[in-house]
Amino acid sequence: MSFLQEVGKRRTFAIISHPDAGKTTITEKVLLFGNAIQKAGTVKGRGSNQHAKSDWMEMEKERGISVTTSVMQFPFNGCLVNLLDTPGHEDFSEDTYRTLTAVDSCLMVIDAAKGVEDRTRKLMEVTRLRDTPIVTFMNKMDREVRDPMEVLDEVESELGMACAPISWPIGCGKEFKGVYHIHRDETILYQSGHGHEIQEVRTIKGLDNPELDVAIGNELALSVREELELVIGAAHEFDLELFLKGELTPVYFGTALGNFGVDHMLEGLTEWAPAPQTREATERPVEATEEKFSGFVFKIQANMDPKHRDRIAFMRIVSGTYTQGMKMNHVRTGKNISISDAVTFMAGDRARAEVAYAGDIIGLHNHGTIQIGDTFTQGENLKFSGIPNFAPELFRRIRLRDPLKQKQLLKGLVQLSEEGAVQVFRPLQNNDLIVGAVGVLQFDVVVSRLKSEYNVEAIYEGISVATARWVECSDGKMQDEFQRKNQTNLALDGGNNLTYIAPTMVNLNLAIERFPDVQFRATREH
């Protein structure tokens, strides 16, 4: 297969949802339909050791939530699909945000009983930054759900995207009979399959087929025909151009737990979602089909292999081909390095990558030299843009039970901040260490990892900090004056960037007023 064909068949996407909308189950079933796993292990398998394939860090096993981002690759419908599993728990937004910068499309999973929830809104704001195309899956149709038309209206009004239903549910809860596939003009009858059983389904061609009346009863068949007439008249038609601009989403209905509807959604995703896209670098746009290799690091994760205390840098290949042993230019450090041991993933199971193409995600072993946002090329000095750091919303002071281990604590915190697990701030005026996060769970993760990886026992204390802002000023004199007058509120983050630590929002607003030439930023490019 030629290079252009290889790139053309790649589909790289992430799943976004509110916690508990069924994202981990969908991930499992996507892999099941892609034949990547033989048995779908659903989260918190009661009394069994069957943990979900994409939830593999110790803490995740305990809590039954997907905390870290795993990458899985599988073939489907003539394409090679790269699925980036994003942390679904309330608290893991920052990693999730960054993962969304590494994909070409997203699958939005909505609990049909609840509709659009808070976390989904936040994640959609991030996809807006790059107008990412979105495919929607309305999940849990085998439970009592809200009126489907009402949920579509909610998606349209709250997320600002037109909805084009591709399939439409027939009943719900105990009365869920299947879906009518509008594009194919056929009814697919629901039979529940669980775990790793993909059930045989029966399809009935045509909405007016008398077989449908026999299968679901005359009364229901009549009301389905009437409802669909209204739906097809009122809803948007699918428009590929609008989908690719992120303005319209195709919508599928089903139940991930019942193994139903996921394959229809995958067929749509592989058919319509874009192949690897052009990516903006500071110097120029980089096309996926360029022959020379380039890529950027969007995530660093420690301890992927409990047997080795290693860290893996996840790299999205933007253009060209990776081959085992090739030389790359690590642009930030200016060093040429030879990469012979990059890995591909199936959630915690690794395989050595011999060859990978634009759109693929590979893992580089990292001994502390690679940071989030780093660009690698075959020589050209490029810097890919759009990989953000987000100002934390929660803060704690961290201190040691054993004061002699200050050095290990600092080393551990700086390494954890480089991989985006948490942000660290060192005030200019004292020896405190302040930890900032986007969600509470990150604090637990940091303490448990400091203990298991750095042998450091740390505890938190409350601290009155409302928010943090990165400060920049093009006028050197003004910056000096600003620093002199605000010493008590200034700190350096893990990358030694000057940060304003605001005890209250009022304090921050006053500082912004007093120093109009200083920029206070809530996000910072890596």
From Swiss-Prot:
Keywords: Cytoplasm, GTP-binding, Nucleotide-binding, Protein biosynthesis. Residues 8-277 form the tr-type G domain. GTP binds at residues 17-24, 85-89, 139-142. One of its GO terms (cellular component) is cytosol. Increases the formation of ribosomal termination complexes and stimulates activities of RF-1 and RF-2. It binds guanine nucleotides and has strong preference for UGA stop codons. It may interact directly with the ribosome. The stimulation of RF-1 and RF-2 is significantly reduced by GTP and GDP, but not by GMP. GO terms for biological process: regulation of translational termination. This is Peptide chain release factor 3. PROSITE patterns: G_TR_1 (PS00301), G_TR_2 (PS51722). One of its GO terms (molecular function) is guanosine tetraphosphate binding. It holds the Pfam family EF-G_D2. Belongs to the TRAFAC class translation factor GTPase superfamily. Classic translation factor GTPase family. PrfC subfamily. It comes from the Bacteria. It comes from Aliivibrio salmonicida (strain LFI1238) (Vibrio salmonicida (strain LFI1238)). The keyword Nucleus does not apply. It is found in: Cytoplasm. SUPFAM superfamilies: EF-G C-terminal domain-like (SSF54980), P-loop containing nucleoside triphosphate hydrolases (SSF52540), Translation proteins (SSF50447). The gene is prfC.
